[in-house]
Regions:
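Stable alpha-helical elements in mature extracytoplasmic
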Residues: 5-9, 28-32, 108-111, 115
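Non-transmembrane alpha-helical segments in soluble domains
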Residues: 10-17, 33-37, 59-62, 116
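A general structural signal marking secondary-structure boundaries and capping sites
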Residues: 19-20, 40, 119
Length: 122
């Protein structure tokens, strides 16, 4: 079993947003992060809109069409969203075992998009 706080998950998310570095230390190679999170580098069947509607999939990350934007999702509604360009992360802890996981995921991603747009208007 693995027990972690939201702060622990936020540290992991920031490390990923910084291409494998945290506090000046390299934890994962930038090449690994790029391979895992770049939707164009995934094999057929895992590219955008092939793995699941409106996502791609790579190395346990759900990938969005925009490069550098991806998320991890737990079975009970846990969510870590990462936008590498803006260094924005979203961490949600949950123990919801409802069956509407797909709808919950879409709503959570839309929340993440709204947060990014609000703090980084273009």
């Amino acid at each position: 079993f693995f027990n972690a706080t939201q702060l622990d998950y936020a540290k992991v998310a920031m490390m990923l947003a910084n291409m494998g570095e945290i506090n000046g230390k390299r934890v994962l190679s930038a090449e690994y992060i790029d391979q895992a999170t770049n939707v164009e580098r995934q094999p057929e069947g895992f590219k955008f809109n092939q793995a699941q509607m409106a996502t791609g999939y790579g190395y346990q990350f759900w990938l969005r069409e925009k490069p550098g934007r991806y998320f991890m999702q737990g079975v009970y509604g846990q969510y870590i969203g990462i936008d590498r360009d803006t260094k924005t992360i979203l961490v949600i802890n949950s123990s919801d075992n409802a069956e509407a996981a797909g709808l919950r995921s879409l709503r959570t991603y839309r929340l993440f998009q709204s947060v990014i747009a609000a703090i980084n208007p273009q």
